[in-house]
From Swiss-Prot:
Record keyword Cell division present: yes
Primary role: Part of the Tol-Pal system, which plays a role in outer membrane invagination during cell division and is important for maintaining outer membrane integrity.
Keyword Cell division set for record: yes
Key words of the record: Cell cycle, Cell division, Periplasm, Signal
Family, as annotated: Belongs to the TolB family.
Gene: tolB
Subcellular location: Periplasm
This protein's name: Tol-Pal system protein TolB
Length: 450
């Protein structure tokens, strides 16, 4: 029964050790050599002392973590040009690099930082020698420089430098892949310190672990954080009143709203993609069942019924259906329910158990926890063909959460007998860990685009 499966997970939530007092620290474990080479030339710093943020290093790390790019190490670059006129295109193409990023940082009279950068198509630059021409609107032949894909400048404060570096990564990623970047997003997660007066803490950080911030602390367990579509609120489960309750909290004001406090179990909150409704799981009638709450009227409707346990709802991109985990077939598998007519279909068949499913933003795949002979690992299933690909080889994987662009998945796993957060690209090639420098972390939730 699913209750037997949920209980060990709940007990595990009570057994975390130290809190992550420092920021999460990302460690790349696999996939660097299989990605597309790119040159992120160190930005030229026109100032005294050290640049407050190493912008080029941040961009390199972002693109590497996407699993699609392999930034060339600085010591292996054929040159470090700061102007496109100085680029030796042939030297870069010999290194297998077809795009490079160059930039400069200056301090203006007002003490602000002026950051300029260019994304350059090396292949086109080599063909045209950086001097391609075309017709202007007036019909004149002019220098077009169409090998320069992006040419931007921004004036920033010191505190904005790191954020802008992520913005550059987003621009470069989208220009080269055609997909939106997710480097300006955040993650929410739960940390626990048994020695603290408030051992259970809900925290948020940039997707790469920087700028960690405490959102909520409690003497009782906190579970299942989920972001609102606007990125301003978190829904979560709290046991602060000695029973499970579902709350929604504004992460900027701290204002909280109680959504569900029924007898027995209240859990697994998940916002609809338009933010108007919240799917939750209640056991007020006996077994676990999925409900939907209208967040404006507070009216609630029951979605699943029967004697089986149904939990872990997740909305389809069009908000017209939900996937959920159910033990109606004996062991946990993932099903889909049509919210208009209530019809239900089993989706997963490969593996003795499949649970914790999420649908990718394009609606093509489910990412889930798949149990096989090797244990609990993340897997991806094609919703059209049913083909399944196991993405991870880590231990006791759980709680997958997909980046808003569908390119990466963050999840909880075990490493050296400790709970850590891990990342894997949606194709399974790139892998990384985000262990806290002091403590254990679980229940990750990736924010929407911010």
């Amino acid at each position: 029964m699913l209750k037997r499966w949920i209980l060990p997970l709940f007990i595990a939530c009570l057994s975390f050790s130290q809190i992550a007092k420092a920021e999460l620290e990302l460690v790349i474990t696999e996939g660097v050599n299989s990605a597309r080479p790119i040159g992120i030339v160190p930005f030229k710093w026109h100032g005294e002392g050290k640049l407050p943020q190493d912008i080029s290093a941040i961009i390199s790390s972002d693109l590497q973590r996407s699993g699609k790019f392999s930034p060339l190490p600085t010591n292996k670059m054929p040159q470090t040009p700061y102007k496109d006129a100085d680029i030796n295109y042939e030297a870069w193409t010999k290194m297998g690099v077809d795009a490079i990023v160059t930039g400069e940082v200056k301090v203006n009279a007002a003490g602000k930082y002026e950051v300029s950068y260019k994304l350059i198509d090396v292949v086109r630059g080599q063909l045209t020698k950086g001097k391609s021409k075309g017709l202007s609107n007036s019909g004149e032949l002019v220098l077009t420089q169409d090998h320069i894909l992006v040419n931007k400048i921004a004036t920033l404060s010191k505190t904005q430098l790191r954020k802008y570096a992520h913005r550059i990564s987003d621009v470069v990623y989208e220009k080269l892949t055609g997909e939106k970047g997710a480097f300006l997003t955040r993650i929410a997660y739960v940390v626990v310190n048994d020695k603290s007066q408030h051992p259970y803490q809900l925290r948020i950080a940039d997707y790469d672990g920087y700028n960690e911030r405490l959102v909520l602390k409690s003497k009782q367990p906190i579970m299942s954080p989920a972001w609102s579509p606007d990125g301003k609120k978190l829904a979560y489960v709290s046991f602060e009143n000695r029973r499970s309750q579902v709350f929604i909290m504004n992460i900027y004001t701290g204002k909280r709203e109680l959504i569900a406090s029924y007898p027995r179990h209240n859990g697994a909150p998940r916002f609809s993609h338009d933010g108007k409704e919240l799917a939750i799981v209640l056991s007020k009638t006996g077994s676990l069942q999925v409900y939907i709450v209208n967040l404006q009227t507070k009216k609630m409707r029951q979605i699943t019924r029967g004697r089986s346990n149904n939990t872990e709802p997740f909305w389809a991109p069009d908000n017209k259906s939900l996937i959920f985990t159910s033990d109606r077939g004996g062991k946990p598998q993932i099903y889909r329910v049509n919210l208009e007519d209530g019809s239900t279909k089993r989706l997963t068949w490969q593996g003795s158990q499949n649970l914790g499913g999420q649908i990718t933003p394009d609606g093509k795949y489910i990412v889930m926890v798949n149990r096989s002979e090797t244990g609990f690992n993340l897997a991806k299933q094609d919703l059209e063909t049913g083909a399944v690909q196991v993405l991870t080889k880590t231990l006791l994987d759980e709680s997958p959460s997909i980046a808003p662009n569908g390119g990466m998945v963050i999840y909880s796993s075990i490493y050296r007998k400790q709970n850590v957060l891990s990342m894997v690209s949606i194709d399974g090639r790139f892998k990384a860990r985000l262990p806290a420098t002091n403590g254990r972390v679980r229940a990750p939730a990736w924010s929407p685009f911010l």
